[in-house]
Amino acid sequence: MAIHKIRAFFNLEASGGIVLALAAIAAMIIANTSLNTWYESFIHAPVAIQIGSFSIAKDAHHWINDGLMAVFFFLVGLELKREVLIGELSNVKQIILPAGAALGGMVMPAIVYLFFNYNEPEFWRGWAIPTATDIAFALGILSLLGNRVPNSLKVFLVSIAIFDDIGAIIIIALFYTNDLSLGSLAIAGLCLPFLYMLNRRNVTSITPYLLIGVIMWIAVLKSGIHATLAGVVLALFIPLFDRTDPEHSPLEELEHDLQNTVSYGILPLFAFANAGISLKGAGFGELFHSVPLGIAAGLFIGKQVGVMLMCWLIFKLGISTMPKGMNFKQIYGAALLCGVGFTMSLFIGGLAFAGETPLFDERLGIIMGSIVSGIAGYMMLKTTLKDEVNVTSVDLTRHS
């Protein structure tokens, strides 16, 4: 029966990654065919919310990236908080490892990019493009491996990506934002003591947290900083335990409620809205311009070298230890996946070279570096992870 096949597919651990990949492939095909006009109309369709004199007007693309993706980052923040309190990151030393790896994974790509452009000072402002990691696509690729992935590896990659995104947001605020609104940031900051008070008073109803979270999200959005940061911050205040009922965990209930919505709704929509890059008019020869070449090399070479070098140094100095159930080959696979810069790199590239005469196309370097990193990371992990339960090979025909 068809319904059984569909149910069996969605029971696969890898199904979320498969749906994400299909959405990205569909977008790339559509954007480079005659359907591109429809695609552009869809992602740039104006959507506005107005209450009295207050209004937020964005196109669909921005609502997906700034709004829906804040929900994804909220879920990631919930998972991260749980791991810090009772999971893989409950030891402070284990937090140092992904934080250091993220730092190395940002510094080295910038160095590689500047090496390729050391004779071109006018292109130095693109140094931050290869420092980014697209957490959604990196985790999507990881999920293709199903439940062979140890939880420690997923937490390690998520932690690196979170620190990386925070670093990217700081870089954007310091180097690429001309109209930062301190007033809006102050409003966002004022939300924090209220969230803290709710947590300390053991308020387990999610509604007041979400109401304050929406206010904080709007303030961060208006400030000029990437609004998804509000999702991570809000997650930190959701109580893990109900002090009056130890069996009740508001945080874990939220995780469970959001998982399918994010995996099969938000992330595929995000992939579809961001992967549709039209390459019409872009020559392959442009890839060898110092800017796209430096970006591609920064993502593929710089990321893996930076992450691995910092991990090796941290282990060598005894600052932290190898996460349980992991080895250097798996860390290397995760380091490769960190080179999937994609959407955040595209965003920074648009800021760095806004209004630039098209002597080159930085998107080519981002796409090439991200694709090569993603494929290499997937292949590396596929060959190193133990196939304890090969969920990708479930026989979908057995229910027919």
UniProtKB/Swiss-Prot annotation:
GO molecular function: sodium:proton antiporter activity
Gene Ontology BP annotations: regulation of pH
Primary localization class, coarse: membrane
Localization per Swiss-Prot or TrEMBL: Cell inner membrane
Tagged with keyword Transmembrane helix: yes
One GO location term (cellular component): plasma membrane
Keywords: Antiport, Cell inner membrane, Cell membrane, Ion transport, Membrane, Sodium, Sodium transport, Transmembrane, Transmembrane helix, Transport
Topology with respect to the bilayer: Multi-pass membrane protein
InterPro entries named in the record: Na/H_antiporter_dom_sf, NhaA
Chain segments annotated as transmembrane: 10-30, 60-80, 95-115, 126-146, 155-175, 178-198, 218-238, 265-285, 295-315, 334-354, 364-384
Catalysed reactions, semicolon-separated: Na(+)(in) + 2 H(+)(out) = Na(+)(out) + 2 H(+)(in)
Glycoprotein listed as a keyword: no
Database matches in NCBIfam families: NhaA (TIGR00773), PRK09560.1 (NF007111), PRK09561.1 (NF007112)
Role according to the record: Na(+)/H(+) antiporter that extrudes sodium in exchange for external protons.
HAMAP family: NhaA (MF_01844)
Similarity comment: family membership: Belongs to the NhaA Na(+)/H(+) (TC 2.A.33) antiporter family.
Protein's UniProt name: Na(+)/H(+) antiporter NhaA
Organism (species): Psychrobacter arcticus (strain DSM 17307 / VKM B-2377 / 273-4)
Gene: nhaA
